[in-house]
């Protein structure tokens, strides 16, 4: 347990300074708090706080990890799909899709804040927010036109992003 907390602290100490202050847009600035939250939740997990608290921490970590995956997946897949489309003589208009990306980040951030609160109505709202983020992630994926892709490496990335969208729907 102590070694896990030490490792999480060391990773945060090494990685976080690179992200703080370097980004200009709020979507890019969200990476540092995401990584800090994951490090903190990792350090707290298994700390003997009780099964209910550890389960809540696990769900919170899952929300943060899904947020990071949605953010990073879009930053990797969008230019790769645009380059692939260009190599085939096509133009992919929907690339990073900052509106959808921002909406997913906001929805998952709100769900992260609302989920641990003790009121059932707020937990239901958090679940609805996660489902909405899953729907928006699926829309984002479809706008990349995965059916036009024949490259195995890109198909695997698209499949991973599809699982993320599906997982958010199930988590909600």
Residue ranges and their predicted role:
Residues 1-172:
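Hydrophobic alpha-helical transmembrane segments of multi-pass integral membrane proteins
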């Amino acid at each position: 347990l102590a070694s896990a907390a030490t490792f999480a602290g060391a990773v945060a100490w090494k990685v976080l300074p690179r992200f703080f202050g370097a980004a200009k847009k709020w979507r890019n600035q969200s990476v540092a708090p995401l990584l800090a939250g994951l490090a903190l939740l990792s350090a707290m997990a298994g700390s003997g706080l009780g099964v209910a608290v550890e389960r809540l921490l696990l769900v919170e970590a899952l929300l943060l990890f899904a947020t990071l995956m949605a953010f990073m997946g879009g930053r990797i897949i969008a230019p790769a799909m645009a380059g692939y489309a260009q190599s085939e003589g096509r133009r992919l208009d929907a690339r990073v899709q900052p509106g959808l990306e921002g909406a997913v980040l906001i929805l998952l951030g709100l769900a992260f804040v609302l989920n641990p609160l003790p009121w059932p109505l707020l937990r239901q709202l958090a679940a609805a927010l996660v489902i909405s983020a899953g729907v928006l992630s699926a829309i984002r994926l479809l706008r990349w036109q995965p059916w036009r892709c024949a490259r195995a490496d890109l198909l695997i990335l698209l499949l991973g992003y599809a699982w993320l969208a599906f997982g958010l729907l199930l988590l909600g």
